[in-house]
Amino acid sequence: MERDEPPPSGGGGGGGSAGFLEPPAALPPPPRNGFCQDELAELDPGTISVSDDRAEQRTCLICGDRATGLHYGIISCEGCKGFFKRSICNKRVYRCSRDKNCVMSRKQRNRCQYCRLLKCLQMGMNRKAIREDGMPGGRNKSIGPVQISEEEIERIMSGQEFEEEANHWSNHGDSDHSSPGNRASESNQPSPGSTLSSSRSVELNGFMAFREQYMGMSVPPHYQYIPHLFSYSGHSPLLPQQARSLDPQSYSLIHQLLSAEDLEPLGTPMLIEDGYAVTQAELFALLCRLADELLFRQIAWIKKLPFFCELSIKDYTCLLSSTWQELILLSSLTVYSKQIFGELADVTAKYSPSDEELHRFSDEGMEVIERLIYLYHKFHQLKVSNEEYACMKAINFLNQDIRGLTSASQLEQLNKRYWYICQDFTEYKYTHQPNRFPDLMMCLPEIRYIAGKMVNVPLEQLPLLFKVVLHSCKTSVGKE
């Protein structure tokens, strides 16, 4: 049976897989590092309810009805939760008699099942949270909505995805442990919404393989490319209309995160005299020095985290080796963006790639360029505050799905706490931007995807990649 009743409000009943939820109404007093040590009540990771007083402040992202909690990754009502589960478990294929853009509301949601399922997928409902047997207990505890390409959505809506999954299972039997609603990708690269696995871990002493990973930035206006980041419906507000206040404990935890950050300008020299022609080798060496400094700052950051004493050194090593590229990319897009897109862009402008470099540039590099340009544009529009950056960084770092962790459940609770705190802060600070929090969170899986794709970009192509990205970003911002 699915857990439909909201847990008791207060102390330990507000946990779960997290998402666009509120934290418990009143958190217990924090211990020495600002975190409570209590075990939160175990909830069905596929669907999490919230207390009545909190739920009244939310509306379903699918139909606008009263939301009862986080279901399969997004805030939704009981009706849409059940509809999505039945559709995926029963592999239903619907048809729309109109233009596939039917209005979704509480009164009209049953008129077109096709458009209802389509919106569930577009808003990020997570099929991996549905067990193949339909019982409670999600197969994947990834927090928040997932990103699905338009092509994959079309395969699901047409039934092609279900047919491929059936064929896959018939060929592989029980050796494949993925849910029939969520066939694991056979590609060597993670999908945009996938979690980082140990196969992508990079040894700390080998960060020269920084090659692949980082520094997202970019933006030309002619780029209409949107890499599957979903825009949330304007008529499905996430926030209550009344003014809110920020909980003192949330403020304290955010302050602790900010205290752990090194927000001083980067020390790597990036100034160069006019007229000097930068070579490929010189630019690559500069990129490596930047990666060195940024990585060092991430290591120092970990040691200052308020929950540092609560996790083992083994877990921290595992987390850092699996996420450091993403942390560097996130920081480059936010707190260090002025230097990266200013001073570094000026250096890359003095580098002229050869015809051979241009000719040999890979398709993987082109995809990374396009995604970085879009992501930079997204961050530039959002104007992420230091507080939001600190929370996003902690959320991304505390990835309980990484293999080899000894305290995955504790990581999940820490992740959820900062997820809720970030949501509280954005709702308090940006009351007129109801979609701001989901917009921020949807950037994280894209950062992971870009970091993974950069692994396939040859080292010698990085100088050209950064030149194109930084030039595009700086040029487009200058025109605004």
Curated annotation (Swiss-Prot):
Q: Where does Zn(2+) 2 bind?
A: 96, 102, 112, 115
> What are the BP-aspect GO terms?
gamete generation; negative regulation of transcription by RNA polymerase II; positive regulation of mesenchymal stem cell differentiation; regulation of transcription by RNA polymerase II
- What are the UniProt keywords, alphabetically? DNA-binding, Metal-binding, Nucleus, Receptor, Transcription, Transcription regulation, Zinc, Zinc-finger
Its annotated compartments are: Nucleus
- Tissue expr: Shows highest expression in the germ cells of the adult testis.
Using the UniProt annotation, give all residue ranges assigned to the region (Sufficient for interaction with UIMC1). 172-253
Q: Where is this region: Disordered?
A: 1-32, 131-150, 162-199
Please tell me where Zn(2+) 1 binds in this chain: 60, 63, 77, 80
Start and end residues of each NR LBD domain: 249-480
The record ties this protein, via PROSITE patterns, to: NR_LBD, NUCLEAR_REC_DBD_1, NUCLEAR_REC_DBD_2
Q: What does this protein do?
A: Orphan nuclear receptor that binds to a response element containing the sequence 5'-TCAAGGTCA-3'. Acts as a regulator of embryonic stem cell pluripotency by mediating repression of POU5F1/OCT4: binds to the DR0 element within the POU5F1/OCT4 promoter and inhibits POU5F1/OCT4 expression during embryonic stem cell differentiation. Involved in the regulation of gene expression in germ cell development during gametogenesis.
Spell out the protein name for this chain.
Nuclear receptor subfamily 6 group A member 1
What is the taxonomic lineage of the source species? Eukaryota, Metazoa, Chordata, Craniata, Vertebrata
Chain's gene name: NR6A1
